[in-house]
Amino acid sequence: MKISKRQQDIYEFIKSEVKEKGYPPSVREIGEAVGLASSSTVHGHLARLEGKGLIRRDPTKPRAIEILSLEDEAETPNVVNIPIIGKVTAGMPITAIENIDEYFPLPEYMAAGETNVFMLEIDGESMINAGILDGDKVIVRQQSSAINGEIVVAMTDENEATCKRFYKEANHFRLQPENDALEPILLNNVTILGKVIGLYRDIR
């Protein structure tokens, strides 16, 4: 089967990412790796690779590229698409489509066997003392209660999902940042969306 040098580079990059991380790269990452600035050009090469039976794509999902001739496919971890939530609509289930920004292909083992999980991308440095950095994605098990001191994702008065350490105190709830420069959030009522059970960080 004849493919171009560029298509070979793209195919090898996808294969190496799947083997190393357990999930495929994004179109942007593919473009950066092979020197293509146009996402439409990358899509064109992917379409040709798919037409030649080397990959299979799911157009309804991001990053959904499957290598069809990966020799050690049995060793590749299973991937689950985890919803990444953004602004939370009050009164809606946390994983309602209105709340989901995108889906992230997480290796199944990182979900720790949990089925009701979602992810939240951390914006800012409010949890740096807990080792949670700006740009990290926390893995969250859905639950509506927490024990004092647990790291949770809760809803603020502005309907934004925030990651903080939870405390129930005498007359209020305290959402405590893990950053000495920031003040806690004090609330009369709090809606807990889930408990943080893991973290994903892209070190590139």
From Swiss-Prot:
Entry's Gene Ontology molecular function annotations:
DNA binding; serine-type endopeptidase activity
| E.C. number | 3.4.21.88
Residues the record annotates as the site (Cleavage) are: A90, G91
Catalytic positions are S126, K164
InterPro entries, per database record:
ArsR-like_HTH, LexA, LexA-like, LexA/Signal_pep-like_sf, LexA_DNA-bd_dom, LexA_repressor, Peptidase_S24_LexA, Peptidase_S24_S26A/B/C
The EC class name is: hydrolase
Keywords from the UniProt entry: Autocatalytic cleavage, DNA damage, DNA repair, DNA replication, DNA-binding, Hydrolase, Repressor, SOS response, Transcription, Transcription regulation
Query: Per the UniProt entry, what is one GO biological process?
Result: DNA repair
Give the protein's biological function.
Represses a number of genes involved in the response to DNA damage (SOS response), including recA and lexA. In the presence of single-stranded DNA, RecA interacts with LexA causing an autocatalytic cleavage which disrupts the DNA-binding part of LexA, leading to derepression of the SOS regulon and eventually DNA repair.
Family classification: Belongs to the peptidase S24 family.
The protein's assembly and partners = Homodimer.
- Name used for this protein in its record: LexA repressor
Gene (UniProt): lexA
